[in-house]
């Protein structure tokens, strides 16, 4: 879907194993992975022998995204809003808003409809308040099986949004 929308680069933030960056590169999109855990970055470095994407070991909220020379990126935020994802996404959004060349960006959030997590009053699978606060336009949501992501019986909704600036 990211390629269909027209995004040129994918930045996988916090997925852990770099699966989103890996899949993006398979689709011939330039891709980067930002992960704070050095052991997970070592795992990603083993994957780049198969397909060339760019893993970085860094705190995504302080990483210098201007060094990537991005054109029309989509940022995939790993982690549920209710489990630290909201803070992670807010920190990255703040960094990106400081880059004058990046006014048009995509944001993709992994959500949940599970009853065991607090509900966001604006919905969007836990991301509604953040989406509204940051003036993001929801493009589409797709649901994927969670067997390969979280230990949940529900599917994982991915909410594709875009900055309105």
What are these regions (language model features)?
Residues 30-35:
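Conserved SAM-binding motif I beta-strand of class I
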Residues 87-153:
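C-terminal substrate-binding/active-site "lid" region of AdoMet-derived donor-dependent transferases
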């Amino acid at each position: 879907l990211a390629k269909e929308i027209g995004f040129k680069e994918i930045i996988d933030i916090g997925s852990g194993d770099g699966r989103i960056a890996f899949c993006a590169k398979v689709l011939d999109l330039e891709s980067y992975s930002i992960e704070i855990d050095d052991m997970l970055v070592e795992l990603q470095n083993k994957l780049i022998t198969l397909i060339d994407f760019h893993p970085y070991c860094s705190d995504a909220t302080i990483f210098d995204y201007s060094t990537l020379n991005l054109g029309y990126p989509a940022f995939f935020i790993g982690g549920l809003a209710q489990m630290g994802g909201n803070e992670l996404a807010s920190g990255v959004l703040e960094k990106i808003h400081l880059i004058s060349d990046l006014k048009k960006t995509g944001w993709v959030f992994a959500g949940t409809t599970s009853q065991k997590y607090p509900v966001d009053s604006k919905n969007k699978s836990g991301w509604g308040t953040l989406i509204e606060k940051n003036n993001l336009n929801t493009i589409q949501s797709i649901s994927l099986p969670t067997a390969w992501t979280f230990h949940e019986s529900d599917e994982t909704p991915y909410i594709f949004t875009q900055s309105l600036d």
